Amino acid sequence: MSYTFSRRDFLKYSAMTAVAVAGAGLLTGCEIQDPNNPVIKKLGYGTTLGTTGGLLKSVDKDSTTGNGVFTFTVKNNSDAPLPMDPNESFVVKVLDKDGNSRWSNYFNLSIEAVPGADGKVPDILPQLPVRTVGEYKVHVPDYAGHAPNPEETLEFTFIPRPAKSPELRITWKILGADLVK
């Protein structure tokens, strides 16, 4: 004996399945994320955006200058060099507990290449060459005086190609409590 699945039954069960899946997403706290603007919520984690990968390794405060020092690794898997202009490629913000911007800096930043294991500084500035991984230290003026409290959030944004695609970015949103060493 066989059962013929009618169009009406198909639509009825499809609708019930869609409602069940949507309800499960609401109950489990399913988070929707924009693939063109990934957000990472932990220090030491990275992601890719197209042919560019990024990893925020550490956030430190330079006690002598008051600057923030963000150690950041970038992988350029593209056929074109990746510009690494600190004043166009990076934005640093501190958000209060409600998510409103309390402090931001996207100008007067500086960047330096981290020396390799042999002690030599690689030639990865002002552009990261094709199919290369580079490690940088991004210096952010006045960060130490505005660093996030435990209930506030640090937002570090990397814009891989600001002139060509300023809307594509990788962002790290890290609670101040997770930055304490």
Language-model regions, residue ranges each:
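C-terminal motif of bacterial Sec signal peptides marking the signal peptidase cleavage site
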Residues: 28-29
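Low-complexity, acidic Ser/Thr/Pro/Gly-rich terminal tails and inter-domain linkers that flank the onset
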Residues: 35-63
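N-terminal secretory signal peptides and thylakoid transit peptides that target proteins
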Residues: 1-18
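Short, well-ordered beta-strand segments enriched in hydrophobic/aromatic residues
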Residues: 68-76
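Solvent-exposed, conformationally flexible loop/turn segments
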Residues: 43-46, 65, 116-117, 127-133, ...
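Short structured motifs
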Residues: 53-59, 117-125, 139-141
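The feature marks short-to-medium sequence segments in extracytoplasmic or secretory-pathway proteins
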Residues: 77-132
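Surface-exposed edge beta-strand/loop patches
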Residues: 134, 139-181
